[in-house]
């Protein structure tokens, strides 16, 4: 005779009689002696209690010791992923982009400057012109800088006596390029007095409905400027990653660890760089340790992300040297063949967990780099302890990534390649370019590839793709029962958030199956 069912009202009380919570703790899951190395596909996070809307989930997180982002999304410093356009929109959408260094130092610095000039608070060094500047010269400047509002001072310098303002409306229909701006400029532009706050300045722009607010001192000398376009960007991109002091967009860039990279970094810092990545496939080297020491002595305010690493021993050396953040991953990227060719690396889930467990004790945020293919992988990387997730392949093929689209077999594609591919190594010559220095191959007569070249399908703009990732990650945290990335980390460590190991058949079950055909649309 079967036992009578228990009183349903005592279900919660009965649950307490179990010796442990359902599923595995993160420590049990990541026991390499039992399960070996794990990737993101090898496990799932178990659901928790949902008692809040997904829109309430905060995705604020640390990039480095001093830099906080509103989203954990970071674009990779690859020459087919991140240049100025990608870095601009990654920052506007709450993340940050790291501009690649497979180009000349001046080209890279120019891209950093373009990001920093895209959005400002007070523009303390506005580009000014003199009354004798011609309309033709202004048109050239408009094409060069991407904007057309230029203050006019007596000597064409700032600070300098303000005499007017030239905007696109002043020159839009002028065909005579030889005219000087003193004949066409607005002679009484709207001004504010030096010392007003950013909030007060923006309020003047709203009330006057003008495009520019010129800030002058008591003697009428131009000292700075506010732009209405920046005010609109503030409204359209509320999560934007900005400097707390300048209100400019945050921008990162990568450099190598050879001597020439020191001068490259000087140019990047002059352009306004906020954070630098030391770009090495194997970050635990004397070259990187020496570079960290030099940067800390030369640019003490510049944040440094070191790597790549996959073990806590690697991490310990870089943390002790003064790294402000770590980049985790070796051979897990979709275009990377390091594990295959070099027999060196680590499954990404195991690498992220072990390095983060160590680094987080020292307050050093970690970035999971490689192996991320979807929102679920992002969630798992963050649950294992990383603070941010770097994406290469996920952002390749977007409108903002470098390169031109081409068609093959009816598909619209863009090139995507690993920085360890032969193509990338030979882009600017073998000696000391970004790819050869990243893989310590500057002096090699025969190059050994650690990456491949390929193509990816057009993904559209990240202006749609990043919000899709953002909303998806919020829903994922809601399912787990965590209202923030901070609480996700805490609840993983204290055992509240549980995991389950997936067998091969479980992975098949968790994907689309038993359909004749289907269309997989991720977002509209």
UniProtKB/Swiss-Prot annotation:
Its EC number is 1.1.1.205. Its cofactor is K(+). One of its GO terms (cellular component) is cytoplasm. K(+) binds at residues 331, 333, 336, 509-511. The active site is at residues 336, 438. Coiled coil: none annotated. It is an enzyme of class 1 (oxidoreductase). One of its GO terms (biological process) is GMP biosynthetic process. It holds the Pfam family IMPDH. One of its GO terms (molecular function) is metal ion binding. Gene3D superfamilies: Aldolase class I. It catalyses: IMP + NAD(+) + H2O = XMP + NADH + H(+). InterPro entries: Aldolase_TIM, CBS_dom, CBS_dom_sf, IMP_DH, IMP_DH/GMP_Rdtase_CS, IMP_DH_GMPRt. SMART domains: CBS, IMPDH. It is found in: Cytoplasm. The modification Phosphoserine is found at residue 125. IMP binds at residues 334, 369-371, 392-393, 416-420, 450. Catalyzes the conversion of inosine 5'-phosphate (IMP) to xanthosine 5'-phosphate (XMP), the first committed and rate-limiting step in the de novo synthesis of guanine nucleotides, and therefore plays an important role in the regulation of cell growth. Belongs to the IMPDH/GMPR family. Homotetramer. Seems to be able to form heterotetramers composed from more than 1 of the 3 IMPDH gene products (IMD2-4). This is Inosine-5'-monophosphate dehydrogenase 4. It comes from Saccharomyces cerevisiae (strain ATCC 204508 / S288c) (Baker's yeast). The lineage of its organism: Eukaryota, Fungi, Dikarya, Ascomycota, Saccharomycotina.
